[in-house]
Amino acid sequence: MVKLANPLYTEWILEAVQKIKKQKQRPSEERICHAVSTSHGLDKKTVSEQLELSVQDGSVLKVTNKGLASYKDPDNPGRFSSVKPGTFPKPTKGSKGPPCNDLRNVDWNKLLKRAIEGLEEPNGSSLKNIEKYLRSQSDLTGTTNHPAFQQRLRLGAKRAVNNGRLLKEGPQYRVNSGSSDGKGAPQYPSAFPSSLPPVSLLPHEKDQPRADPIPICSFCLGTKESNREKKPEELLSCADCGSSGHPSCLKFCPELTANVKALRWQCIECKTCSACRVQGKNADNMLFCDSCDRGFHMECCDPPLSRMPKGMWICQVCRPKKKGRKLLHEKAAQIKRRYAKPIGRPKNKLKQRLLSVTSDEGSMSAFTGRGSPGRGQKTKVSTTPSSGHAASGKHSSSRLAVTDPTRPGATTKTTTSSTYISASTLKVNKKTKGLIDGLTKFFTPSPDGRRSRGEIIDFSKHYRPRKKVSQKQSCTSHVLATDTDIKISIKQESADVSLVGNKELVTEEDLDVFKQAQELSWEKIECESGVEDCGRYPSVIEFGKYEIQTWYSSPYPQEYARLPKLYLCEFCLKYMKSKNILLRHSKKCGWFHPPANEIYRRKDLSVFEVDGNMSKIYCQNLCLLAKLFLDHKTLYYDVEPFLFYVLTKNDEKGCHLVGYFSKEKLCQQKYNVSCIMIMPQHQRQGFGRFLIDFSYLLSRREGQAGSPEKPLSDLGRLSYLAYWKSVILEYLYRHHERHISIKAISRATGMCPHDIATTLQHLHMIDRRDGRFVIIRREKLILGHMEKLKNCSRPNELDPESLRWTPMLISNAVVSEEEREAEKEAERLMEQASCWEKEEQEILSSRVSSRQSSAKVQSKNKYLHSPERRPVAGERGQLLELSKESSEEEEEEEEEDDEEEEEEEEEESIQTSPPRLTKPQSVSIKRKRPFVVKKKRGRKRRRINSSVTTETISETTEVLNEPFDNSDEERPMPQLEPTCEIPVEEGGRKPVLRKAFPHQPGKKRQTEEEEGEDNHFFKTAALCRKDVDDDAEHLKEGSKDNPEPLKCRQVWPKGAKRGLSKWKQSKERKTGFKLNLYTPPETPMEPEDQVTIEEQKELSEDKGSPVGMEREVTETVDALLPQEGSRREETGIPVSPHKSPGGKVDEEDLIRGEEEGEEEGEEEGEREEQEEEEEVTTEKDLDGAKSKENPEPEISMEKEDPVHLGDHEEDEDEEEEPSHNEDHDADDEDDGHMEAANMERGDLPRETFKDALEGQEAFLDLSIQPSHSNPEVLMNCGVDLTMSCNSEPKELAGDTGTAPESDAEPPEEQTQKQDQKNSDGVDAELEEGGPAAVEIDSETAQAVQSLTQENREHDDTFPDCAETQEACRSLQNYTHTDQSPQIATTLDECQQSDHSSPVSSVHSHPGQSVRSVNSPSVPALENSYAQISPDQTAITVPPLQNMETSPMMDVPSVSDHSQQVVDSGFSDLGSIESTTENYENPSSYDSTMGGSICGNGSSQNSCSYSSLTSSNLTQNSCAVTQQMSNISGSCSMLQQTSISSPPTCSVKSPQGCVVERPPSSSQQLAQCSMAANFTPPMQLADIPETSNANIGLYERMGQSDFGAGHYPQPSATFSLAKLQQLTNTLIDHSLPYSHSAAVTSYANSASLSTPLSNTGLVQLSQSPHSVPGGPQAQATMTPPPNLTPPPMNLPPPLLQRNMAASNIGISHSQRLQTQIASKGHVSMRTKAASLSPAAATHQSQIYGRSQTVAMQGPARTLTMQRGMNMSVNLMPAPAYNVNSVNMNMNTLNAMNGYSMSQPMMNSGYHSNHGYMNQTPQYPMQMQMGMMGSQPYAQQPMQTPPHANMMYTAPGHHGYMNTGMSKQSLNGSYMRR
């Protein structure tokens, strides 16, 4: 026979089958294909084809069960590969895997017999002796040497005993010679030829006709010439149907075969009971004789049997008559009596009895043959369809569930496979009889002997009998046994037929008893005996007062599913078998409503939010119930990741289930419904629409667009389409404005743009005109719909006011009510703006007016429900942001058309009146800001709670709310308020902030640009905040005057991955989860960041009511397309708009700028707006974190327009975030990631990293901005510090205008920065900065919030709070006074001057490219690190120094060098996307994260940690400015060999630092130190070029040291003392650890680490608690934001912070010494360390010090202060801690001279796995830098985002790993 399949492939397939079975899995086609392709490299398509051919060949057996096809090895069909059919070595079944192939054909029975007989032991032989004997046989060496021999031998012996071949007495085995009663009769006559009695035909068998034999074996399809083993073998043919089979396939032994040939043999389908001779009756209870293969009903046996006998069974015909019949009769009578009475008898016996007798009810007959093991025991699955049973009236055809297909009567037979079942299979195992009552599903085991061949055929078609058949008809229903092998078919026969057996044996009395028992059993389960087999299990349920027919089967446990009726408790949904059980349960069940919180109640309807993780059983039961009415539902048991919103109708009895929908807690695609179901009795009453509406309400409250999980079922599609149509028509009916955008609709309705676009297409309301998409209003359609609605109002309408619900921890989605309100207003404004062209025009004419009008619009557009719209806002923002050029259509392909046209419209309107949109937004923001501020705080807190530190935030919700959720927003609110200066600006600028926020969503690019121009500080802050502020910022913005900020937050960066686990991990960092790097851009539901961005953008647009509206409509479509372009445009555009020296450009101008470039102007306008906002309010500083998103663009602006810096930075921060996110989504994954990382998003590793990188970039970009962003973070720690920092920089920015820039950076530096920035980084900055700001904002904000929370908690709730805040304030005041103004001014000036690149301002060394600025390692010294803008890419940084400069630099591309290593190590994100813009973004991340990891550590730190105020502000102003300078020359800070002159640094202030690139390092120290004490000294001209970058980072850490006071608030968790201890230890170790000399080596690290430790550590260690150690306080508070940025670039920034902490902990001189040891630069740091009493106090706290040495190597920014990393761990704030851990590891690594531990980096990322991976890159690079390219396996620290773990990051090198474990520093810190 020619084989169709390639024999080699067939062999591979069989191997795969064995392999899969060995893994205890079903050999499905998919698994087989996978296994073969994996092991042999064959492509799956070929495998699939070969598998089919092999099945056709017969070399592979295909078995269908429950509709699923499985494949078996015909030679080894059993569970274990069994022996070839011919041999009986059934025992071989157990053989596993390929090695079994050798043992496959071994006949274990023969071997055992040979051994036992050979040993000739009288009492039998032990298995050990048998094994020894067999091993001694030379001819068996091949078998005995097999590794599985012993196991297989034992298995063979066991099976032989079970089959009766061997007898086992104790441990001895002996051959069974057969027992008197036949039970022991040998199974294989061959073994005991005399055992089987001779057979003879019975009288009724003679002269019967015989059917023509079919010459093909029904099992192997072979012929008599070729059986399965390709050997000739005679066929046995059925006398009735002619079906044939090989004895080997039937598993007949030779003796049985000989006997059967002499008799009239019947196959299993035709088998007739030889006693009652009724064919087909009760076939399930038929036994097959192992001697003649005749069939007997158990009740027909003599004596009748109640259960299947075990082992061999010989019928009464063959059984020798022994001791007369009397004995048998007596025994039979006993058995009869014992089992006749149903009452006391065991259940299964009764069942069996019932089965055998009950014909009406339908007895269960097991097809599994009862025969000898050798016989085909395969269970026959009866394939008769339920209807078939009834249909076939003939008893003969229906007698067996499985009828021979060949017979005409066998309608029941579904599969032909039944034909192939051997006769033995037919034999029913009497044991299988089960109760028909269905109470339990019985698995009928076939006799052991016959089990081997369990081939189940087509189980899928057999279900438990449900059909009621007329009594006369014997219908067999099929019950699938739990065991796949056995199918039980229930034979329904009339009761009278059931007893056709040996009548003399079954008396009438017995029959009556049986029938009575049967009836009782049926009553108990309350179902008629003949239940129809409807194919649904269960077919009916009793639920409450309803009896409901099910629609589909549900996977209830078999014993329940097989019941005709299931009883469910309507409250707890528990399922029960009978009414009695239900009644008993209902008395005990104390549930009257779902086990969850009621989040909605109106009239008699309630909705409960059930957490699948909390109420697992309830949710599983709910899913099982839902499956009864849903066709395509696959999830029943894995309910933990879901929330179930259960709708109930309430009365006095309880809350009765109406329906529910489930929702994934963290869904990347932002699906708001996974499964939705309404109970049948409540359908057609509007509840489905109610739940759909409710799901969208939740999405709106979360501030993001939602969409049901795709694909939708048919019913779901209908329901949703109807809902979408009605919602859109009603929206259009309410909004008659000329410009309507998909974005606006999305924001108002919560629908995702794709669904809106689809629906508009269905409504034929979208068209393409002039190459643009436009929405066509079909008034008739709209009015017709409204008429229908009026005529028949909806019965169950949702009332949003009745919802009492706070969004989950989802950082981006979480929006507090206040935030929602703020968002609502903003959205309303937006709506108005988009709705009312007139207003837009007015706004265009008068921007101020437009602002006012936008405010008006807000109130007018209440319908929009900004909170509700918020979800969509992000997406809309996307659309708006998208410009035609951007072709963001790709991102949302489905939305593409609609969005495009809408966007185009929006764009047109925007172009037409660009200023309007921007201006109204700003105006509305300003207006709203005051009232929204509080709201924002609340929102922020919520966000914080969910994303960063839920507990901490909750406790200090009020205080932490703003800072945590939106670092930027929060910072202005709390910090601004506390800081006198800030509050003043706050009042003026808050509106701007809001405006910026809205802008962000609407004009991400603008925001970026503005941020880049205005908000160098903010950029840093924004980056930090962006993560934290993504939420906080959005919240803030929303609260301030636009919900958009919230939306922005909620929206994930497009590329960012949103993971619940991650979110959960950093619940507190929830806000920071903006880095949805993994979400594909085209996902309609963009990452929350993206949505947030879009929403913010739109909100900002909305804020400008006229313009907002116009923008909405036109921009929505345009934005979608141009989003990328916009962002890029922003990058480019900022230069012109931001260039204006009057950075403060009129709001109108700013607005105009925005409006001018919805695509390009949008960027500018937003920047301007942001600048304005910054001017208007220090709050903008809070936004600054966001602005970090566009820090680079802002930097450009700032450089050019120092005045704009203050306002703009904040504004930009806000706006940038959305833009950034969006861009980040599409183009700048890095940006988003950096933002997220800055935000302290451990949960979104990638995004976090990106965010962090971006944040750092932003920090780098904006030296001043970092100051702002840090203040934002600091806000948590101490608002005062942040405020002072923010306000001072702003004031300076505003007052000084360009002065700050020059201050921040010497003209040369500025020029360098500018040149670099302009050349490389302007665009990149804008692009990169924006995204970084956005994402970092959330994370940073969260981190800050966690710290702030703790600080606030300390202030509000905890005793530490006052301390921390005091420390913070002292630091803030100190820093503020000394550095803040100076730095702010300088920074601003520098930044603006270096308009090109924030980094540029800090860029002290021309060698460092602008990219460096963006690169994470350059955060503080942005310009030093050539800013790594998306354009430039971090790798571009030409000088090693640049790379080094930014330890946080996420420049995987830099992996080749220590510098590059540093860069990539900077952020996980960066690592991941090291070569591309990501690195640039990481640079932003860097600054945000590490507060400029390399040089910008302090600035970044300040941004990150509000607590860093003093030192941080010193850092911030000085450091921020310095950061700018340092960032510009990131190496500068690191390089500051003259770290020993920290005071100089302070004195130096940003300007000095900036001017003196090399000294910049010392400056950074000063910054870090918080006090001006060390500002000037920090400048180390000596370490100019090479060290500059590295020092920037490390110096910053050193500065942190100097600002030891910052550490005071290690977050409530850490005590100052502990921090100090850690710091001291760390510092001590740190110094030795980092060798200043090696850029690649640790020498440089030391120097770098010193500055870093000053800068970064301060931030990290700065805790709001420590007033005396203001820097410490700052550090603690700062850490969260910093941490946030560090998450990606965390190692450097964190290291910086840690170092700072370390330095702080150690005396400044000490630090200096350490650093000096590392490098000359470091020495200055030590001085700085002695910065302030606080510093001294917190020296130990600031363990970051040790890290100071970490990155000293100028070229080795990479050295990220490893020691510092440890110090960070001290931070109590969870997010903060995580970051600190990262920093610690980095610092430690640097210090140790080992590689930076990935954990440091990772922990910074909130255990973001993705970022952790990235971290490894960076740490590796860093390590290389520190250790001379000694890569260390980065062990991801994966500490929970909020875990306050010193050692969260395990270093590769002991102490490094522990974060400080090996270093003494580590040890002391560990005890934190």
Curated annotation (Swiss-Prot):
Domain notes: The N-terminus is involved in transcriptional activation while the C-terminus is involved in transcriptional repression.
Domain H15 stretches: 104-177
Bias type Low complexity, positions: 189-202, 386-395, 846-860, 946-959, 1393-1410
Renumbered zinc finger spans (C2HC MYST-type): 566-591
Annotated segments matching region Interaction with BRPF1: 570-826
Function of the protein: Histone acetyltransferase which may be involved in both positive and negative regulation of transcription. Required for RUNX2-dependent transcriptional activation. Component of the MOZ/MORF complex which has a histone H3 acetyltransferase activity. Involved in cerebral cortex development.
Biased composition (Basic residues): 925-944, 991-1004
Location of the region described as Catalytic in the Swiss-Prot/TrEMBL record: 536-826
Annotated stretches, region: Interaction with RUNX1 and RUNX2: 1359-1872
Keyword Nucleus appears in the UniProt entry: yes
One cellular component term from this protein's GO annotations in UniProt: nucleus
Residue numbers bearing the N6-acetyllysine modification: K633, K856, K860, K862
Name this polypeptide is given: Histone acetyltransferase KAT6B
Phosphoserine modifications at: S356, S866
Domain SAMD1-like winged helix (WH): 1-77
UniProt-listed GO biological process terms: cellular response to leukemia inhibitory factor; negative regulation of DNA-templated transcription; nucleosome assembly; positive regulation of DNA-templated transcription; regulation of developmental process; regulation of DNA-templated transcription; regulation of hemopoiesis
Chain segments carrying region Disordered: 70-103, 168-207, 361-417, 846-1018, 1031-1252, 1283-1358, 1388-1418
Protein family: Belongs to the MYST (SAS/MOZ) family.
Biased composition regions of type Acidic residues, renumbered to the chain: 887-909, 1155-1176, 1208-1217
Lineage, uppermost ranks: Eukaryota, Metazoa, Chordata, Craniata, Vertebrata
